[in-house]
Amino acid sequence: VLPLSQCTDLNLVGGKAIGLARLITADFSAPQGFCITTEAYTQSLHASGFIEHEEWQKAYALSGNERASALADCRIRIGRIETSQLAAHCLTALQGLHQPPNTRWAVRSSATNEDMAHTSFAGLYRTHLCVALFDIDAALKDLWASLWEERVVSYQVRQSSHTAPRMAVVVQPMIEAQSAGVAYSIHPVT
């Protein structure tokens, strides 16, 4: 678990966390937060016997209903992963942000292949907004599981990428915004 301001390694924190770190270190107004690293993702999966690069290659090689079934099984297994030790680290990081106990949180994907020059993955991974403190662990697992959706694998196939992506997760306090938005200069999927 790293503070957003210390997120500099793409392979460890993903594209979104790097972008947020750049904003924070350049003194733009962005909520402070932290990143649950790809290392935490990999260690948590491996501790449960889930070897992501092997499972990815299996799913990547399949198609149709066979792929859908394999991916569904992966998502179920990820949802059952034991994360109590990681949750304790997250709680410490949350307390370090000095937010009131009733704060709601944004739990956001930051995959290693997300928000890059040649790949967007816009809208393919999940985001959870207004998450209560004790629901962050479930949101984390759901974001990890969103790597294992058919639409993600299909996009990877179209990009000719055979490598299993890894997911970091950004956690930030929700803010009262007057407006928000995203602008695309090219189509986010094709």
Language-model features: where?
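Short beta-strand elements
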Residues: 126-130, 173, 182-190
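N-terminal beta-alpha lobe that positions the nucleotide/phosphoryl donor
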Residues: 1-170, 179
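Conserved, single-site charged/polar hotspot
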Residues: 176
